[in-house]
């Protein structure tokens, strides 16, 4: 028990005089309730006051903390002492007989006709007998089950079936772990896996890692920092500005004020005092989800900005998280006098404005961060960046953007510009390889702020995963059998007892249900809303749920039909089919405790920090792919809430057909982050070579080989069985063949060693005998990019896409239609189009025909120019299919018509309904098209022949990025302010950025409907940041003019 208690250690480094319980309570209130600034301040979605929000939650927030034990799950009761179930504990193997539980006081039971009297345990057993799905209409039943994924169990699942399947793998303790450990928090998975999973505390330098292939497990008591004071001469000296890790004392107060954190965890203090930090070495620190990694990164970034006075680049995986972090860091920027800049899609100037007085924190997506760094290298200013922080570093192994991240980091390392790299990662199986790639020290710790208890549900049986088990029987410990005495109809609808498992937890506590697909999220949410105890869920914070529904309807333009049915019960779904605004409202309501159950896809585990009392994994699948151990750990890591000592519980529902795969997943090594530079015809490596030649980081084969040998691909070449140098030679041949590269000087003047040459047919020469001429390139033969090659590099795309868009632009230039935006939008869509043009979604033939026939003649001209005649229209109507010779063009035109409606300011919900596209997918199309327009602008800047396109696409970019009227465009510069919020601000009299910057957040809350105080604070802070940037620009211009005058006086 003592060691178990270590998992829940309280923060050890006090930053204030407050007591622990008070600070935890205040932190909870600060995060969830947005403390108002005055008595008249309103909060959350309605005009409800803070007292209303606190009603019924005082015991939860300020009462005694929830306690946990080894064998029992705890749950807070309602105000009258009654929970939904009289006994919710998980008994151990020596389980307590069901009839031995004491009965609550019958007098306090609810009397509503929809709520069964739980005072009598016999009646409690019949809880779901009151719910009869047979009473529902046929239409309602179709709503639940239409299109649902089939998770029916071909065999009746039970514990024995599961354990029989587990015999494929007898757990064996590796020799390294045979020594007795004082820490019993070591997961059984790590014991049976051996490789790559680290628990306890460990700090390993990159030099030490070169001599070992994997990281050793370390227990809690290991003194990993005994040699901190060695090599003091290498410690990086920087001007200290206070006692808080060298930062001013006001930073400590701001962290408490804005984050509600009054002390650091022990590991955070250790990490901030590591030799890698003190000696300014690269560092990777890896901890489980919800361990508090981001706060360490923020302290390091503030220290770089304020103490070393160098800019910082913060790379985040998702645009929505970038925008949230921009908002969160804006108050710090105002008080500490630095600039925060967002780099996503069309936002962010490249290269950024140079500044003399203030430092900049660039917060960027992976793709835009790479473009930003390239622009700084191109103008010889990479030294302005002092620190690069990468969140979710393990995404370097993801296909697509993983190659972009790897190329970006390779260039930063190759520059040798004294830029420190700090990476945050989940626990992965090959940290030693990532460390070798980045030449970084590694800090790991198996830390969770609260205890996590993991369960597997096999039929009615719940098996607890015992962290200290040595055999299958010890690892999978029978805990209890769930039996809610469902009616027959409910049994058919909910064979996995989801409603019962959720009702044990919600609505007093929050619950996440991870589903394999987006459609399944909606189906499960509908199902739960039908069969959970109606009165208990319906009455819980009823008025605030109505306010939430009103906010979604007014601010997002639509209330989803599914959400309209589920939100009254505090149940919602969350996936990419919703717009960003819809997801934010649901997330905020969840943090408030208004929404208590979210049915979501796996992206919620990686992207948004929404802790839960209980996490249920509906099925071990992500889409069609089976769940990996890394994804599983991310999902279950959301269970438990720091600050109140509340333990977390996770339940994985396993069907008999998946038993073997579940076992293989649990006993498998942690996922490895593998390089994808060589994937998809090595397009990632092509782009890397293109950019390093364009940036003059490599001018010959020798330079290229040296750079490519510093990639993660090179580190993993042996295990991946990849011949990196051969791939580079093949890419060079293709680039010369496609006129992307050319010799830097005439071949006759080049000194070529015949033993070091590569050969390629010079295809540019027509009508010549085969093999007549060959291009000879030695190791030191200099080469450079052609015009089209440089255009591809500037646009941030591979040369094949550059050639394709060059062809489209050339053809359109001869007969460009400018009577509307359709032709320009077609070129934008071409930029992201695949071979069929059906990326994101295919065209709907019937809708396309209907829209085409209603278009005015000047708009139909675009169709005719692409060869679409009346005969094609008749065939489209007859076949109701876009298949055929014009399928590519028609799929593209379908997206063009959608974007045209968006530019004409039609509401997103209306456009989504008109074209039968999910709102979130539509928003993704807009974001993708904005990025494409930005890339086309950069491409055209490099090609003189396309001089006329640049202002046209700049206008398209501006309109798509704002999607608002002229008077609203200034307001939409604010992060996360969309068209509806901008209209609301404008109507309330806040018509300029200056109007917003001058107002107090509390006044915004009072003036606008559905404006939480935290959002108001972030909007005001963002407005001030925009004005600070404008002021900074004017000051720079003034200083430059002064310098010019001084120079002229001297002459």
Curated annotation (Swiss-Prot):
Residues 1-28, 61-112 are annotated as: Disordered. It catalyses: Couples ATP hydrolysis with the unwinding of duplex DNA by translocating in the 3'-5' direction; ATP + H2O = ADP + phosphate + H(+). It holds the Pfam family POLQ_helical. GO terms for cellular component: chromosome; nucleus. It comes from the Eukaryota. Keywords: ATP-binding, Chromosome, DNA damage, DNA repair, DNA-binding, Helicase, Hydrolase, Isomerase, Nucleotide-binding, Nucleus. Residues 64-78, 89-102 have a biased composition (Polar residues). ATP binds at residues 287-294. Single-stranded 3'-5' DNA helicase that plays a key role in homology-driven double-strand break (DSB) repair. Involved in different DSB repair mechanisms that are guided by annealing of extensive stretches of complementary bases at break ends, such as microhomology-mediated end-joining (MMEJ), single-strand annealing (SSA) or synthesis-dependent strand annealing (SDSA). This is Helicase POLQ-like. It comes from Drosophila melanogaster (Fruit fly).
